[in-house]
């Protein structure tokens, strides 16, 4: 059984890749600071529709990332180059485990690092997989640690129970390759 807070999955959704560092089409859409994170946590609770877990832990992790790395850069899909290499980052499992075991914040970074090493490519941006609950805010910490922007989008528009429930499934875009990483860095 997978325990929330112990396992994080990163999924590659785009097949194309740009060898150069991230270059947007124009200006970064917005800077996300502590006030915006607080507001997003409220919205994440509403969009969770009763699922996805409480966004509180994700909010704390995002606020800590702002203290450590500075405000986040969020770009729109329109800003994202067509050949951008993007990773969706999220946790999976029962969110009640987080009551006893808080993530250390490096699970997502470890998963992204492992996926980049396996693919031989660096990601241009990170995106949330779902808009609801904890997973709305966790990718912000990963993006900040990796020094890349976060994309203003998600896989469905709310929380969902299974990975195959994302919009990309309708277009036969696979949820692989994928990586899992625990709090000890085991991949």
Q: Where on the chain are the PLM-derived regions?
A:
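Short, Lys/Arg-enriched N-terminal segments with co-localized hydrophobic residues
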Residues: 10-28
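Cationic, low-complexity basic patches in intrinsically disordered or flexible, solvent-exposed regions
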Residues: 4
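Glycine-enriched loop-and-adjacent helix/strand subsegments that border the catalytic/binding cleft
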Residues: 53
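Non-transmembrane, aqueous-exposed alpha-helical and coiled segments at domain scale
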Residues: 30-44, 48, 56-187
């Amino acid at each position: 059984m997978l325990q929330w807070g112990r396992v994080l999955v990163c999924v590659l959704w785009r097949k194309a890749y740009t060898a150069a560092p991230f270059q947007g089409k124009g200006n970064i859409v917005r800077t996300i600071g502590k006030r915006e994170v607080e507001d997003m946590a409220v919205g994440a609770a509403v969009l969770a529709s009763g699922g996805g877990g409480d966004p509180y832990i994700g909010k704390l992790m995002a606020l800590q990332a702002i203290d450590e790395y500075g405000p986040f850069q969020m770009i729109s899909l329109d800003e994202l180059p067509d050949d951008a290499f993007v990773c969706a980052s999220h946790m999976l499992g029962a969110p009640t485990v987080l009551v006893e075991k808080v993530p250390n914040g490096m699970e997502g970074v470890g998963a992204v690092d492992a996926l980049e090493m396996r693919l031989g490519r660096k990601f241009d941006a990170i995106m949330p997989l779902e808009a609801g609950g904890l997973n709305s805010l966790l990718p912000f910490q990963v993006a900040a640690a990796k020094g890349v922007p976060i994309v203003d989008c998600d896989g469905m528009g709310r929380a969902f129970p299974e990975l195959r429930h994302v919009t990309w499934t309708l277009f036969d875009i696979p949820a692989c390759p994928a990586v899992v990483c625990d709090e000890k860095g085991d991949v």
